[in-house]
């Protein structure tokens, strides 16, 4: 028997619309529509990955080194785009619609050991609830097998807003817009841990690979209100905006793990067994809940009007979301290894004792700040 790893809703949405619109009233009576496009760079709050994934000893051993996991990960900076459309009903009333998307970006870290003399052994540490003490699963173990582990974080962000604006009577070059509307946001992140631990010669060539996947999807739906102060003097325009959205964050966490091996069929075709090392039958599946969330945003921008219709601008924004689920925080290292073949149990493995790990559904906050350059045109 063998074997014992919102939001950037963000980027100055209403500010871009302000520059696209220019002054409170169109330059000519027909310029009621405006369109804007932005190229963005976004920096997200790092994604927590507090659970140590790979160490060189037992986690409670003196001088142990954490080689993978046990910190936080980010994919910064993240490139994206935003489109803004606005329609001015009259000199005071307007409608603004914005959509943005920051495509999936990933980052990986890995560690490996040859399993040869002089190499270190790699361990996946966990707390074994069946014996109530710290334990490890060998990923590489000299001289029997070599091993490697990789942790990958990927994320994307998208959303949109629909606002109605009301312009207060202007004061010289200044004006104030009140706004209210609806905001949506989706933040999706995946944290995946893969390992490979094949035998070293002269043992038979085999396959022993695990995958543990934690996926978190957060969808926000809320009503928002805010105000914008805009300055318009000659070719220069600028604005500052504050907004607050209140609503529901729909949090969904999907957990999936499996082992691929041919160790149990005389090294024949690869078999797949449920459960990896951290995503096991007891915590696998889809888990969801709704939480109240607050999403405030502040943004600033400065633009230069090329002519009566075209404007170029730069913008900065900061957005905060009070409640999101992030994948690395959903890992529970309290494990009952009896339920998984990956821990060296003969298939089919049967749970004996407590059904651990379970999903605790941990939540935290999230922020994103962005820099962007844009072009607006009104007609």
Model segments located where?
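Outer-membrane beta-barrel biogenesis signature
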Residues: 19-36, 44, 48-49, 166
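Extracellular/periplasm-exposed beta-strand and loop segments of Gram-negative cell-envelope proteins
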Residues: 48-57, 61-76, 103-156, 187-219, ...
